[in-house]
């Protein structure tokens, strides 16, 4: 692994900066050319090795610059590490691994006091306990991520199944209502009130019909061939069957109407509970418009069946002349005045726009 003896503080292969990758796809190229290298958890470390630092006593500034990306636990200069002339090498240990990742990504190949820094991981400085802790943290992170992903996938499947079930129920209810309506229309138009099996009526309907009719369609043929001995009994069966059919049709209509009412109630409750703000505003606006239209209709309604709201205004008092002839003359004068007032045309109201058009303004001179 090591190129110079493999001792601690010497130059390792993973410390050497790699060349720029020229075979990288165009859509994967960044703002500046980079080398391509994959880091696993055993190659990453809290220890960072900084090479290319100018030897002008800038250790304090270097530590302050790296402290921007996380808490630093310790730092020191590596005097025995092979370096270029007039440069120094420093070792910095961060408190957590994520801070070290960020600092390496941000500070690698950055200009610092005239020099170009090269930052790399130094896992060879880790102790056995630090390595064990690093691997355990990585394992816990992987377990947590996979659990969240599995939970999300399971939740998504449950939501999809619930949605499919609701769609199936809605389709089923719509088909049932359509079938039952068609059956009711057919039975109302025909003389025979028997309903088709496509209405999906409960089995008790047909069983009760067969039991109560006492074998009507099948047993009536031999009875009718017995020279009219059971004529009164057969007529009684017919009347009983007719009344039974009417009762069944009424009960079916009620049963068909009930699901629709329940569904309407459920939908109204859902709307009241989950109505958005925009929908509420639109509903209020619609109600105001309906009230305004109703008020306009009541005002312009020519019929006498007007809805009066509030107390009636007092009528105009009529002057009594204490003489029939004088009262007749006064009524004639009042009617004549009303006719004259109604026949006089109203003068047209001159709008300010008409005034402006009749008297055009003088055009301003352009200077």
From Swiss-Prot:
One Gene Ontology cellular component annotation held by this UniProt entry: nucleoplasm
GO molecular function ontology, one term from the record: RNA binding
Keyword Transmembrane helix listed: no
RRM domain segment(s): 46-124
TM regions (residue ranges): none
Ranges for region Disordered: 217-243, 280-302, 343-367
Annotated GO biological process: mRNA processing; RNA splicing
Keywords of the record: mRNA processing, mRNA splicing, RNA-binding, Spliceosome
Subunit note: Component of the minor spliceosome. Within this complex, interacts with ARMC7 and PRPF8/PRP8.
Family: Belongs to the RBM48 family.
Function: As a component of the minor spliceosome, involved in the splicing of U12-type introns in pre-mRNAs.
Record PANTHER family: RNA-BINDING PROTEIN 48 (PTHR20957:SF1)
Full protein name: RNA-binding protein 48
Organism of origin: Homo sapiens
